[in-house]
């Protein structure tokens, strides 16, 4: 019976699907595809692929990532210690639109969060933003205000780095486009 268990059976759960609408698939390590559904466990190295659907992932450190229609997100690794509220999080947004909302890892040690697109690396300092990647790899990144359940909003900061250099974004709805690996 043990021979039929997948790698995910032995891995640590790093989050779960907290919103599911329409068509989406989670590709596990080793190539197994699992149809997305509410409360489905998510593991490091999973890939989220949406068709005509949307998925939101709630990570163990309270980070939230929304993956919209026709998008692809590759989770590299998430490590989290709830006692110290520290760890690391890294993933790649490859296609489509993804919204990121910071959890505890970004709030306690922002340098431990690494988010990549085909043309940029984003450093997070406790905030929300969206990134849209088109079919040729161009990345559009927009900083968003973070609001709590009482409607209190603040704007954090992100850095966007490419081969051309780095910019700091700290104004609500500030945007940048990175067209190719060598542009800013």
PLM region spans:
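N-terminal signal peptide c-region/cleavage motif recognized by signal peptidases
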Residues: 6-8
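Outer membrane pore-forming secretion/assembly proteins and partners of Gram-negative envelopes
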Residues: 130, 183-184
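Flexible, surface-exposed loop/linker segments and immediately adjacent secondary-structure boundaries
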Residues: 11-52, 56-166, 171-175
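Sec-dependent signal peptide recognition
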Residues: 1-3
